[in-house]
Amino acid sequence: MNFDVNTIPVSERVHITKNLLRYGISIDQETGKIDYIKVTTVPEVRCESIHLIRHAETEAVAKHEFMCDTSNNCGFTASGIEITRKQAAELDEYNFDIALYGPIPRVVNTQLIIMERPQKFEAIKVHKLHGIDNTGWEYKSFDELCNTPLFIARELENNMFARTPSGTSWGMVIANCVDVLDLINEQYKGKRVLLISQGSVLRAFQILLRKRKPPWDDFTVEGMYHVGDDAGKKKNYGVIDKIY
């Protein structure tokens, strides 16, 4: 049995489709797959730069488990805290004007670690800076989920509409990031912006700003720490990435 996109409200699918279209991204209404529209003009990004720090490494990552926004496995590992503090000590060289951080506890707590050290910028919470919520999958392993229609649709077939009943889809994460870009363009023109959020938000910005060709150039599960041996995988929790 395949995932049925009709289980997702029409209003939600329309919102996702319209927001992605603003950045020249089409979405197939049956498969949920996205692609860049070749001849299109996308909105200008008016800030000077955008960087993102992903939340600190969590216990869920260390245990190869999924987590939701509020699950008990979202606490940070000792190494995760250490890495984030080290990154926080190096932020002066970027001369950020403002930091925007997401609303969920592990992101809020990462922001608190960063701001423990006196910084030159203010940090402001932004509700739309919200990545994937895996409610319904928390504490589960890859092996427990990998053969389910929903997991196959969301993580292997890259269906932008697929989500758990109380979670969020990749399409909604990207649509939310369109709204964040609107906010940046309206309020932080010419500024150096730091985002503190989740890995799914990093991917969403990379897709919107065409840093990936095609927009979805891999299976997300290949980089998941839930899958197999993570010894050879680059752990970028608590570490800064340049988006724009």
Question: What are these model-predicted stretches?
Answer:
Residues 59-63, 71-75, 116-176:
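Phosphate-handling substructures
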